[in-house]
Structure formats: structure tokens, C-alpha cells
């Protein structure tokens, strides 16, 4: 009982209002019964109607408490009004602080918290304008993340060219971690879009290599982890992305080779399947860039196919891979044409190995406060201007700008179509032509031409039209030369264009007829003589037989004649010997090859400008002599050199024969002599010398077995042969011998032979006769002296070496003439002279008529010294 009393005393009973009591009498609101231990009976609540009417007049509110509550409410209202009044001067700062606090609270709130409408969030963000605050930077970071993620999700083949500039508009240096995470996530979710993501990454890598390097690092780390965990899906996505980056040359193909060798080192069904997929994507690029690596990979596949214990499905995949390789990857090109957006020289290739120590820089994925945020943003704005151009900062994405850009693109397309029809070019040429033809003098013409607005890139049309109009005239008009001179001296641009025109017209001068060629040459002659063009333009001329045509030689001739007419020959020679311009004239006066040097000398001499080649002649005279090869043995057959420059040698012979004679007379000579004579001479000569002559006769091969005499003798021969001989007696000891009998010491020949060569010293005469020779000859010419044997171009020597002897000719002259290098033979021989051997005499007679006029004396060639 005591407990119950304590319990009752512990309860605070409120004071009843006046006129009311808490007695156990029934009340209108609730009935209470005294505590009883017996269970209470089921009682119904009495209807409240009667009690409510009874208590309606009783007041329930304490007036004092009501007054107190009213007073407190008024006090709170007054305090609130005072606070509001005191808060007005610091509105902005407090708004900023309140907005920051609320934004921070919202960002840190767990997911599932209070929903914030976008309009309220934007209004809240608009209130935060302090760029140095952490809240503003966090807000910008969130916007950057959403923008990069949205652009990557929108990209496809058709719009990649438009998405990439927008992507560069975002700060990819600050958000490179966000970019890499977003593009890797998008690629793993949609593998068919991997080439598009790789192309986007390749474009970004050309301008921001650190972004491409970070992407590669994360892909390699991702592959390593997935390979260790046997995560096939992640391995496939990582290797596919790396393969396409390798195709785009963002990463070196060595990385793909390392991954393939790792996968095939211990082949399993999954690893071989991943390797097959990687090879199909990167195989074409591997074979183009690293053939040995591709061969090693396919050899490994072949070994796995034949030896490894793998599933039938994987074996079939390897066989399909070999078929793809056989088809040259026609269904798996390295780069599709529409995604080949990066020039090869612009791409930056990273060399990262599979086993290198790599940092993924995961801290770039989360927000960090940047104290120098504004400076970094300004730096990226400059970089963006360099990447996209200066006008990219002011671009707006409104519909009006889109419409205007569409209109501009349509106008550009129309312009392209118009340009391709060459209508503008034809109109421009017509305008220039009419302007030139309607002008009275060159000054008026230049003034009108300067007013013509030339489109960009069509400036060369003006010099071209001036030269074309000049070439169309019947005779050269100085009017055009003055126009060209004026333009070339007005601006360096026109001077360069005329220099380019000179090179172009010289290369194509063979297309013009002679009259047009003459006008063009005189036009450029005027330009050079007035120094409107630099003389270095003559460096395009290479004066030699191979690089010139008849038209170009005529052009050079007329050009130099015009220069000589304007400048005078002394001044022209002075200009040609100018030390500063000498390198430009190396093509006109070549010193690299004696043949080209002679060609230049002969050319300028023939056109009347031999004075310009004096230094070239001196150079040719002093140039080192060619080495003469050693003489072969006397009995060995030798073939002398053939040279093509026979016209410059004293002993050059041009003779033509009509009757070849073949002699089969026996002789005891040690050689079978063959002579080829082109002589057509009618001569009467009494030559008392047995000479071994070397002749260029008219291809009358003869086989003579008559012995060659070794003693002094006097032979009288009377030959009559129709031959024209320009050959001079020469002493050559090299020939082609075929000896069959020793030569006799004396011989007396008496033959009628058709000889086409004059007698010579130093060589064995190649004569052709069919009968034993007994000849009685009348000699009117003294024997020639030993002429220096020269090796000439385009000459054939097939005579054996022999000894030259003096002969005592029976001549009609009262005294012996002085020895000379050339002999004049006018002999009429009806029989060849008999030659006597040591033991027997051979006779052969062959009818011949060989009138030979005296050869003309030619100057010694400076390139071939005489041999003694």
C-alpha cells in the first residue's frame, strides 16, 4: 500500500479550475472508476449529449496563461522584426554565405534526401559568384563532369567532327581524369563503338598528349588487373580499345605484340579467344608496321592450333583468323575511311610497355580545391584559342547561330560548285586580256591591271596572261616587256611570280611554235636585261645533249641574242663571269663532264657567243688527262677503243667505199689484217715505205695473208679506187691481229686493188685483195711522218701493233719535203705491191681504184694527248 501511496504522491495533479473538481462523479467527457482488483464489466460509453449541455457554461481557459502567451508571441514578433531590420545592410554577403551553406548541405546529403527542383538548384548556383570559393569550384567541377560525359555519350560517326570541337571547349586539362573514366566506361558498355571512341581519343591526343597517355596508362592497368582476376569481359574491352588506339597510332604496336605474346604464352580457351579478337582488330596495322612481329604471332597461333589442347570452338576461331589474314583484312580494316581524321605526321605515338611502372592518377577523378583556379582557366582559354581558332570563344549555341552557320555552309558549297566549273577563272582571264588589249600604252595598262581584284591563289594568272598575250603577237612588242618590268619592280610578289613563270615556260617551251617561242624568249630577255628578274633564274637551264631539245636550244639562242642586243657583248660577258652569279650559271657552262663542257663550248660558238666560253675552254684544256690503258702483247688480239668525238681530232677519217675486196692470197705475215676504209680517193702515189696503217675505211673487210716487209723498200704502186677519204695518216699501234705467218723482210707488191685508205705509219693496213699483189705505183706525195696515235671516240681500230719504218719513196718532186704529220696521197694503183717473204714470194693482184684527196688538217683535240 505504501508503494501505491508513493506512486500516487509522485503524480502531479493539476489544479482544477474554479467551479470544477476532479471528484469521481460522472462527467461529460470521461468517467473514471476507483481502482478495483476485480475485472471491470463491459460498459458502454454514455452518450455525451446531456453532460455537454451541462458543462457548456463552464470556462476552460486560464486567463492569466492566455495573457502570458499573447505577450510572448508579441515579443517574438518584435525580435524578428528587429533582426530583419538589422540584416538589411549585409544582404549580399549573408546571401552568399547562406547559399554556400545550403549548397554544401545539399551536396553532402546522402542519396535519398530531399529532392531539389532544378529551377531552385540553378537559382542557388546563380547566387554563388565567388570564383575563389570552394563551392563555386565544386559547382564548376560538377558541370564539367556532366558536360564531358554527355558529349562522349552523344558521339557517333556522323557527328564526331562537331563533337570534338565542343569537347575541346571544356577544360580537358583539369578534367582529363573525368574524360578517361567516362570514355572507358562508355567503351566497355558498347564495344561496337570502340573505333569511334579511339578516333576521338586520337584527335584529343594530337593537341593534349597528356590526356592520351593517361588513357593508355589506365587501360593497361585495367588489363593487368582483369588478366590476374580472369575477368574475360574486362580483358576483351581493354584489349579492343588498345587495339584501335594502336591503329590510330596513339600507342606503339609493340604494346599490342606484348599483350598477344602474354595471352598466347600459356594458351587457354579464354586467352586464345581474347588474342584472336585482338589480332583481328590490330592485325592489318601489325603487318604494315611490324611484319616480323605479325609473323611471330601467327606462328604461335599455328602451333596452338596443331599442338595445344583447346576447345573446338577456339580452334575454329583460329582458322577463321587465318582466313581473315588471307583475305587481307577486308572486313577488318585498321581505320575506316570516315574515321581517318588525323594526319600521320600530326599524331603523337606513346611508347608504353606492358610491364612498365604506370601511375593511373586516380586523384584526378575527384574534386580538389585549386587556389590558382582563375589562372589555370585563363591558360586553358589561350590553349583552346590555339586549338580551335580565335573565333571559337565567342560561339553561341543558339538557334540563330545554327541557322546562320547552315546558310554559310550552303554558300560555301555553292562557291565550291562555281569554282569547279572554272567560270571565275575564265572571266578573270577575259578581263585581263581585254584590259591589255584596250590600253594605249604600258603605263595605262599597268594602272588598269592593278585595279583588278585577283582572288586569293590566282595571282599567277596575271603574269601568265601577260606572257601568253605577248606570244600571240606576230612580232615581239616591247609593250609587254615594259608591263612585265613595271610589275616586277612594283612588288616582290610579282617578281617571284615572273621567276616561277620563267621556269614553267622553259620546261614547256617545246609546246610552242617558233614564232611564239621567239616572242617569249625576247620577253624574258627584256626582263633580264632590265634587272626586273634575278639572273639566278638561269639556273633552271642545263645545257647538255640529254636535257635540251631543239626548242629549248632555240629559246636559249634567242634569249642570249636579245641580252647581247640590250646589254652589249662586253657587259654580258662581265655579267656571266660575276662571282656571285657563277653558281647559277653552272648549268649553262657545265664542268662536271668533258662531254657536256664541249657541248656547251660548241653551242655558244655556233650561235656567235664563243667569247663567253673562254674560261670554259681554259678549264677543258687544263683538266686532267684520262689514263691510257697499257698496251696488250704484240700477238694478242686487241680491240681499240671507239670514241664518239672523232670530229675534233686531227686524224679523224670519214671515208666511204663502194667496193669491198676480199683477199685470200697466201702470205707469211704474222697477222691477218683487217682494214675498214671509208676513203673514196683517187691518188697517184709512189710510196716507198712499208707502213702499217690504221684506217677507218668503208667497212671493206679483207683478209690478207701477204707478209709485211721489215726492210726498207721502194714500192711503186699505181692504184685506182673510188673513195672519199678525209682520214689522215695516223700512227696507231693497237689493233686486232690474227697472225699466221712471219712477215718477210722484203716485198714487192704489184696488185690492182681497190684501196680506200691512204698509207699510214704505226699501224698495219687492213687491205682486201684476192690475187698476189704486184703493183707499180706512182707516188706524188712524200711519206707521212709518224703521227701521234690518238684514241678517239667513235673509231674502230682492228689493226695489230707494228713498227713504223722510214720509206724512200720514188717521188716526182725534186726534193724530199719536210716531214709532216699528214701525208697527201694521190696515187693510182692498179696492182698491189708484191711482198717477199724469206723463202718464197706471194703475189696477189686485186683490181682497185682508190683516188683519195688529201685529208684536211684538223685541230688537235684538247682531251686526247698524243702517244709516242
UniProtKB/Swiss-Prot annotation:
Protein name: Pre-mRNA-splicing factor cwc22
Region of interest called Disordered, as start-end residue ranges on this chain: 1-96, 389-420, 626-868
A Gene Ontology biological process term: mRNA splicing, via spliceosome
UniProt source species: Emericella nidulans (strain FGSC A4 / ATCC 38163 / CBS 112.46 / NRRL 194 / M139)
MI domain location: 427-543
Domain of life (superkingdom): Eukaryota
Any Gene Ontology CC annotation: catalytic step 2 spliceosome
Lineage: Eukaryota, Fungi, Dikarya, Ascomycota, Pezizomycotina
Subcellular location: Cytoplasm; Nucleus
Cited function: Involved in pre-mRNA splicing.
Amino acid at each position: 500500500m505504501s508503494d501505491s501511496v508513493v506512486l500516487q504522491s509522485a503524480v502531479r495533479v493539476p489544479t482544477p479550475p474554479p467551479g470544477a473538481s476532479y471528484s469521481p462523479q460522472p462527467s461529460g467527457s470521461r468517467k473514471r472508476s476507483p481502482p478495483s482488483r476485480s475485472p471491470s464489466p463491459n460498459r458502454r460509453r454514455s452518450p455525451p449529449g446531456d453532460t455537454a449541455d451541462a458543462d457548456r457554461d463552464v470556462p476552460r481557459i486560464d486567463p492569466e496563461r492566455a495573457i502570458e502567451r499573447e505577450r510572448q508571441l508579441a515579443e517574438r514578433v518584435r525580435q524578428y522584426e528587429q533582426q530583419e531590420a538589422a540584416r538589411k545592410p549585409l544582404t549580399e554577403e549573408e546571401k552568399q554565405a547562406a547559399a554556400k551553406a545550403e549548397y554544401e548541405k545539399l551536396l553532402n546529403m546522402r542519396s535519398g534526401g530531399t529532392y531539389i527542383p532544378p529551377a531552385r538548384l540553378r537559382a542557388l548556383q546563380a547566387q554563388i559568384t565567388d570564383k575563389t570559393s570552394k563551392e563555386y569550384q565544386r559547382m564548376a567541377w560538377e558541370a564539367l563532369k556532366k558536360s564531358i560525359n554527355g558529349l562522349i555519350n552523344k558521339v557517333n560517326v556522323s557527328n564526331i567532327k562537331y563533337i570534338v570541337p565542343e569537347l575541346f571547349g571544356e577544360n580537358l586539362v583539369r578534367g582529363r581524369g573525368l574524360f578517361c573514366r567516362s570514355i572507358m566506361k562508355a567503351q566497355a558498355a558498347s564495344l561496337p563503338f570502340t573505333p569511334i571512341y579511339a578516333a576521338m581519343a586520337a584527335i584529343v591526343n594530337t593537341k593534349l598528349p597528356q590526356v592520351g597517355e593517361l588513357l593508355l596508362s589506365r587501360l593497361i592497368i585495367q588489363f593487368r588487373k582483369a588478366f590476374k582476376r580472369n575477368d574475360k569481359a574486362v580483358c576483351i574491352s581493354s584489349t579492343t580499345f588498345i587495339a584501335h588506339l594502336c591503329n590510330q597510332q596513339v600507342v606503339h604496336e609493340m604494346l599490342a605484340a606484348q599483350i598477344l605474346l602474354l595471352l598466347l604464352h600459356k594458351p587457354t580457351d579464354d586467352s586464345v579467344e581474347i588474342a584472336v579478337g585482338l589480332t583481328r582488330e590490330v592485325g592489318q596495322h601489325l603487318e604494315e608496321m611490324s611484319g616480323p612481329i605479325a609473323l611471330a604471332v601467327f606462328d604461335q597461333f599455328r602451333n596452338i592450333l596443331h599442338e595445344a589442347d583447346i576447345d573446338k570452338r577456339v580452334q575454329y576461331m583460329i582458322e577463321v583468323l587465318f582466313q581473315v589474314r588471307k583475305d587481307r583484312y577486308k572486313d577488318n580494316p585498321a581505320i575506316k575511311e570516315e574515321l581517318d581524321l588525323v594526319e600521320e605526321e600530326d599524331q603523337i605515338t606513346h611508347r608504353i610497355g606492358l610491364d612498365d611502372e604506370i601511375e593511373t592518377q586516380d586523384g584526378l577523378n575527384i574534386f580538389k580545391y585549386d587556389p590558382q583556379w582563375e589562372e589555370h582557366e585563363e591558360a586553358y582559354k589561350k590553349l583552346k584559342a590555339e586549338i580551335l581558332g580565335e573565333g571559337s570563344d565567342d560561339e553561341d549555341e543558339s538557334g540563330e547561330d545554327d541557322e546562320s552557320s547552315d546558310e554559310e555552309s550552303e554558300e560555301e558549297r555553292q562557291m565550291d560548285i562555281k569554282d569547279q566549273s572554272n567560270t571565275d577563272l575564265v572571266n578573270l582571264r577575259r578581263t585581263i586580256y581585254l584590259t591589255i588589249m584596250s590600253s594605249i600604252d604600258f603605263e595605262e595598262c599597268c594602272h588598269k591591271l592593278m585595279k583588278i581584284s585577283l582572288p586569293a591563289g590566282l595571282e599567277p594568272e596575271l603574269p601568265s596572261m601577260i606572257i601568253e598575250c605577248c606570244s600571240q603577237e606576230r612580232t615581239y612588242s616591247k609593250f609587254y616587256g615594259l608591263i612585265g618590268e613595271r610589275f616586277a619592280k612594283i612588288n616582290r610578289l610579282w617578281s617571284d611570280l615572273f621567276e616561277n613563270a620563267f621556269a614553267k615556260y622553259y620546261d614547256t617551251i617545246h609546246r610552242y611554235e617558233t614564232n611564239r617561242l621567239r616572242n617569249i624568249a625576247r620577253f624574258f630577255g627584256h626582263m633580264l636585261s632590265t634587272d626586273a628578274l634575278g639572273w639566278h633564274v638561269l639556273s633552271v637551264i642545263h645545257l647538255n645533249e640529254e636535257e635540251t631539245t631543239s626548242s629549248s636550244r632555240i629559246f636559249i639562242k634567242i634569249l642570249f641574242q636579245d641580252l647581247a642586243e640590250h646589254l652589249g657583248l662586253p657587259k654580258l660577258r662581265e655579267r656571266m663571269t660575276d662571282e656571285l652569279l657563277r653558281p647559277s650559271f653552272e648549268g649553262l657552262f657545265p664542268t662536271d663532264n668533258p662531254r657536256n663542257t664541249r657541248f656547251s663550248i660548241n653551242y655558244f660558238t655556233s650561235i656567235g657567243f664563243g667569247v663567253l666560253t673562254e674560261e670554259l675552254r681554259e678549264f677543258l684544256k687544263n683538266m686532267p688527262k684520262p689514263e691510257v690503258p697499257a698496251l696488250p702483247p704484240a700477238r694478242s688480239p686487241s680491240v681499240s677503243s671507239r670514241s664518239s668525238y672523232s670530229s675534233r681530232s686531227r686524224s679523224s677519217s670519214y671515208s666511204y667505199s663502194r667496193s669491198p675486196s676480199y683477199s685470200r692470197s697466201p702470205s707469211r705475215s704474222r697477222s691477218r689484217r683487217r682494214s675498214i676504209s671509208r676513203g673514196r680517193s683517187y691518188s697517184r702515189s709512189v710510196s716507198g715505205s712499208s707502213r702499217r696503217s690504221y684506217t677507218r675505211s668503208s667497212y671493206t673487210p679483207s683478209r690478207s695473208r701477204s707478209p709485211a716487209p721489215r726492210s726498207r723498200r721502194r714500192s711503186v704502186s699505181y692504184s685506182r679506187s673510188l673513195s672519199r677519204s678525209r682520214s689522215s695518216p695516223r700512227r696507231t699501234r693497237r689493233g686486232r691481229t690474227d697472225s699466221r705467218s712471219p712477215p718477210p723482210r722484203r716485198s714487192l707488191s704489184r696488185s690492182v686493188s681497190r684501196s680506200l685508205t691512204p698509207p699510214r705509219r704505226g699501224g698495219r693496213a687492213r687491205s682486201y685483195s684476192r690475187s698476189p699483189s704486184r703493183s707499180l705505183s706512182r707516188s706524188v706525195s712524200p711519206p707521212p711522218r709518224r703521227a701521234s696515235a690518238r684514241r678517239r671516240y667513235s673509231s674502230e681500230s682492228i689493226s695489230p701493233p707494228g713498227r713504223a719504218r722510214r720509206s724512200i719513196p720514188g717521188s716526182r718532186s725534186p726534193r724530199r719535203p719536210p716531214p709532216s704529220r699528214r701525208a697527201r696521197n694521190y696515187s693510182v694503183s692498179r696492182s698491189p705491191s708484191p711482198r717477199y717473204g724469206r723463202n718464197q714470194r706471194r703475189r696477189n693482184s686485186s683490181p682497185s681504184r682508190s683516188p683519195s684527196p688529201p685529208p684536211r688538217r684538223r685541230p688537235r683535240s684538247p682531251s686526247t694527248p698524243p702517244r709516242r
